[in-house]
């Protein structure tokens, strides 16, 4: 397996200092879990360089509880130095550790040219593109009363429409390589009765933009209760010729490589024979090797990818 979506820090206010020892520990944990390569992909919004350009973007939205919540979230998250982060991950890579330099880049409507300018000149291997926010509403914050009140106030079809519109613009921007947790709009467990039209739009957007799609195990930890993407969407990605990466979206060391066997089975069931790895933002195919590991416990056990 490749675990191509990993964060050094959990959410919330904390000391945001990247260290070589921390990256090395992630690599060691990955190898213990049978993960052959990882990508460190911290959130762009956690860095001061992004805050200098994008901070306050939510003020373009009408005053509301969700706008206030977004301001609080952003201010709690920011503080890391992008130059130091890049330096540390490159040092680990240069030392021969199985890691590539990445970043998770949120979608900012009408501002992706500003995002591209922030990223310009850094030697990233892979950039993940994510939609976590619809306007100032951080819809994936399912532990927040403010967020869930907004879910209650909106028709689920309208949420999925707005999400698909954002995916279209993100893909067409050409800024990112991989569509992270592609159907994150299901995070709260709320889906249209028949989501086919939205799945078709997501698959078409990824194919049109030349993006890979991420198969992300973190959905099993959410009310969605399944991986991102849903099996139907994964099948549509395969039919459209969209490559895939594999990921846990772990923010903690002990979740690196989590449920890799389940992810492998999803890939094989959808017809995939390889996953996408990246170097210098150039994609390469990494064959899927499906074989039980010594810790395989049968159904739901571990499978090598």
Show the residue positions of the predicted features.
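Charged catalytic cores and adjacent phosphate/nucleic-acid-binding surfaces used
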Residues: 1-11, 49, 136, 174, ...
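An N-terminally biased module of ancient metal coordination in phosphate/nucleic-acid-related enzymes
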Residues: 1-109, 187-189, 193, 197, ...
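Short acidic/polar active-site loop segments enriched in Thr and Asp
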Residues: 36-37, 125, 177, 273
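Residues at the C-termini of beta-strands that transition into short coil/loop
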Residues: 103, 130-131, 279
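Acidic (Asp/Glu)-rich catalytic clusters
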Residues: 1, 31-32, 86-96, 116-125, ...
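Aromatic- and acidic-residue-enriched segments that line the glycan-binding/catalytic groove
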Residues: 52-62, 118-124, 142
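Divalent metal-binding pocket/active-site signature
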Residues: 20, 45, 107-110, 122, ...
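Generic structural signal for well-ordered alpha-helices
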Residues: 23-27, 82-90, 164-167, 199, ...
């Amino acid at each position: 397996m490749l675990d191509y979506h990993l964060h050094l820090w959990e959410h919330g206010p904390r000391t945001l200092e990247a260290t070589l020892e921390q990256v090395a520990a992630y690599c060691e944990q990955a190898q213990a879990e049978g993960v052959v390569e990882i990508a460190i992909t911290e959130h762009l919004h956690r860095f001061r360089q992004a805050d200098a350009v994008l901070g306050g973007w939510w003020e373009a939205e009408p005053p509301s509880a969700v706008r206030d919540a977004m301001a609080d979230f952003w201010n709690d998250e920011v503080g890391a130095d992008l130059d130091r982060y890049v330096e540390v991950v490159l040092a680990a890579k240069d030392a021969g550790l199985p890691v590539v330099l990445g970043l998770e880049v949120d979608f900012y409507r009408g501002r992706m040219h500003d995002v591209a300018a922030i990223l310009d000149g850094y030697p990233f291997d892979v950039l993940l593109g994510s939609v976590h926010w619809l306007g100032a509403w951080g819809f994936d914050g399912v532990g927040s009363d403010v967020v869930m009140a907004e879910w209650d106030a909106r028709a689920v079809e309208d949420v999925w429409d707005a999400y698909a519109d954002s995916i279209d613009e993100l893909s067409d921007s050409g800024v990112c390589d991989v569509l992270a947790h592609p159907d994150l709009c299901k995070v709260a467990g709320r889906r249209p009765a028949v989501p086919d039209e939205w799945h078709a739009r997501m698959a078409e957007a990824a194919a049109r933009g030349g993006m890979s799609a991420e198969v992300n195990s973190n959905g099993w930890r959410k009310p969605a209760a399944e991986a991102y993407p849903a099996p139907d969407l994964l099948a549509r990605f395969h039919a459209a010729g969209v490559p895939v990466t594999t990921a846990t979206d772990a923010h903690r060391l002990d979740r690196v490589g989590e449920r890799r066997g389940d992810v492998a089975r999803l890939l094989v069931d959808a017809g995939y024979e390889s996953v996408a790895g990246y170097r210098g933002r150039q994609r390469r195919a990494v064959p899927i090797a499906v074989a039980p590991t010594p810790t395989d416990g049968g159904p739901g056990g571990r499978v090598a990818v």
